[in-house]
Amino acid sequence: IRCTGSKECYSPCYKATGCPNAKC
């Protein structure tokens, strides 16, 4: 799973491995 946008911060991706909050 990858976080590519700010809206990902509020999805399961936010807590997924490889999706640090630094991406938000």
UniProtKB/Swiss-Prot annotation:
Disulfide topology: C3-C24
Highest taxon listed in the record's lineage: Eukaryota
Tissue expression remark: Expressed by the venom gland.
Function according to Swiss-Prot or TrEMBL: Blocks voltage-gated potassium channels.
Pfam families: Toxin_2 (PF00451)
The entry's keywords: Disulfide bond, Ion channel impairing toxin, Potassium channel impairing toxin, Secreted, Toxin
Subcellular location, principal: secreted
Family (UniProt): Belongs to the short scorpion toxin superfamily. Potassium channel inhibitor family. Alpha-KTx 06 subfamily.
Name of this protein: Potassium channel toxin alpha-KTx 6 OcyKTx5
Biological classification of the source: Eukaryota, Metazoa, Ecdysozoa, Arthropoda, Chelicerata
Other comment: This peptide elutes at 21.22 minutes and comes from a fraction that contains 2 components.
Free-text comment on this protein's domains from its UniProt entry: Has the structural arrangement of an alpha-helix connected to antiparallel beta-sheets by disulfide bonds (CS-alpha/beta).
Compartments (UniProt record): Secreted
